[in-house]
Amino acid sequence: FVSKIEVQAKAALTDLQAGANQAQVIFEIVNKELVELLGSQARRVRLAKVAPTVIMLAGLQGAGKTTLAGKLAKYFADLGDTPILVASDLQRPNAVTQLQVVGQNAGIPVFAPEPGNGVGNPVEVARAGIAFAKAKLHNIVIVDTAGRLGVDAELMQEAKNIRDAISPDEILFVVDAMTGQDAVRTAQAF
């Protein structure tokens, strides 16, 4: 991705007319490549034919998964759905508490049977959260998973185990724009 942009930018800047805006040329090249990489069409979240729709959030620590979980749940609630948040990030200190605060602020219930801070089994929490959602007739389940400061074998295995256990209808990869060039490598790893 980056090397492709670099080649195009060098070629465009070589052919640049006097007085043209170099920054604008580079911006247009990056924009074109991002649209090609990510797709030009907006796509709605894939909803399950039979409720609940299960959405798993994945990504590195600090990327905004927990915040997105709350915003996504609020979006669905505003549409008339009955979302629930599932606290499967049991590694990061106070991650469960953070999701509970986000849920409370958004008016969304949170399934959090474990205190987190390294205690509990995230796969079992995800599985139990879906069972709870079915029993309480929630039609959208958003599973907030753990991140790490970087991609590692433990993180990838945990994400895979949760995915295999809950068979989500959607897996949303959350990345912070500040991740920069590493975002592509991280997305490929996930």
Role assignments for model-derived ranges:
Residues 121-135, 148-190:
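Conserved catalytic-core segment of NTP-binding enzymes
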Residues 1-145:
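Primarily NTPase-proximal linker/entry elements flanking Walker-type ATP/GTP-binding cores
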